[in-house]
């Protein structure tokens, strides 16, 4: 969202409000569709107040789930996981699904959706605490600590015949490790590349010929392409939340708008566990 390069959205300009997903309360409305007190989500950015058109907002139903869930599992994060896995990854029951950034906002949901679908799941995360979270709290079959283990060897240990779906949130060396361990017909979902966003030289996959040898494919996905189907995903995932099949963990930081830069940087150090949310405290 900030890189001055061709992308799926224009970069944020200098002196423009920093783009971000928001959960807000309506304090005044001239629209018959929204009233004072309604909770809404949108992309109003890092600011305390915003003027918005009703068509750019989505009303939140607190009776369906805790409002914070609309920034995570029932928001863009959940939509990314749902459509990335099911529409691009095309998992089949008993497939081996490997997820990088698995303790992050999208990754943890992808793994749980794969389990609901009957897949074997392997999560890649950094540190013992995150790996224990994956296996002990949200049901991944195996976890790999990229900080202390050889990722390629560990994937091979848990997926003897190779992986069937790799959901990539990280890029770089971990993507390389996945490419070394593809099953025939594997699908790689390119969702993000957090390891590459701040580098001066982006590391591309050197062993891409593995796609040829294994008749595999690698495809990028942008969640906005599925906007007309968000309702489908929200309905299904809200049901799984109520049934206890799906869990959502948010890492909520309470502070002011001025705390955003420090909070944002947690994403790049791996300090967050789950969806990172800055909750603006009332003055």
Ranges and model annotations:
Residues 2-46:
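Glycine-rich beta-strand-centered segment in the early N-terminal region that forms part
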Residues 33-34, 91, 182:
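Short, well-ordered loop/turn sites that connect or cap secondary structure elements
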Residues 37, 61, 94, 140, ...:
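Local beta-strand N-terminus motif with an aromatic residue
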Residues 40-41, 98, 189:
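Hydrophobic beta-strand signal
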Residues 43-56, 229:
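A structural motif shared across PLP-dependent enzymes of the aminotransferase-like
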Residues 71-149:
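Mid-domain Rossmann-like dinucleotide-binding core that forms the NAD(H)/NADP(H) cofactor-binding site
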Residues 132, 137-138, 142-219:
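Glycine-rich cofactor phosphate-binding loops and adjacent beta1-alpha1 units
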Residues 227-283:
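C-terminal hydrophobic helical "lid"/dimerization subdomain
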């Amino acid at each position: 969202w900030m890189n001055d390069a061709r992308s799926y959205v224009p970069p944020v300009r200098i002196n423009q409000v920093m783009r971000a997903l928001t959960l807000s309360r309506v304090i005044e409305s001239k629209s018959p569709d929204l009233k004072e007190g309604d909770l809404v989500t949108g992309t109003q950015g890092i600011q305390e107040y915003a003027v918005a058109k009703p068509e750019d907002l989505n009303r939140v139903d607190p009776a369906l789930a805790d409002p914070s869930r609309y920034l995570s599992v029932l928001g863009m994060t959940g939509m990314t996981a749902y459509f990335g896995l099911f529409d691009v990854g095309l998992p089949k029951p008993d497939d081996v699904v490997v997820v990088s950034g698995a303790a992050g906002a999208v990754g943890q949901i992808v793994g749980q959706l794969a389990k609901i679908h009957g897949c074997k799941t392997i999560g890649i995360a950094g540190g013992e605490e995150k790996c224990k979270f994956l296996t002990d709290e949200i049901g991944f079959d195996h976890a790999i600590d990229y900080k202390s283990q050889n990722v390629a060897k560990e994937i091979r240990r848990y997926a003897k015949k190779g992986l069937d779906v790799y959901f990539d949130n990280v890029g770089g060396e971990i993507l390389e490790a996945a490419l070394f361990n593809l099953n025939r017909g594997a699908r790689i979902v390119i969702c993000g590349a957090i390891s590459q966003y701040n580098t001066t030289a982006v590391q591309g996959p050197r062993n891409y010929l593995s796609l040829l040898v294994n008749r595999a494919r690698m495809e990028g996905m942008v969640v906005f392409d599925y906007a007309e189907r968000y309702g489908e995903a929200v309905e299904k995932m809200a049901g799984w939340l109520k049934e206890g099949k799906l869990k959502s963990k948010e890492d909520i930081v309470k502070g002011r708008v001025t705390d955003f830069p420090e909070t944002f940087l947690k994403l790049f150090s791996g300090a967050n566990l789950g969806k990172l949310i800055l909750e603006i405290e009332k003055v």
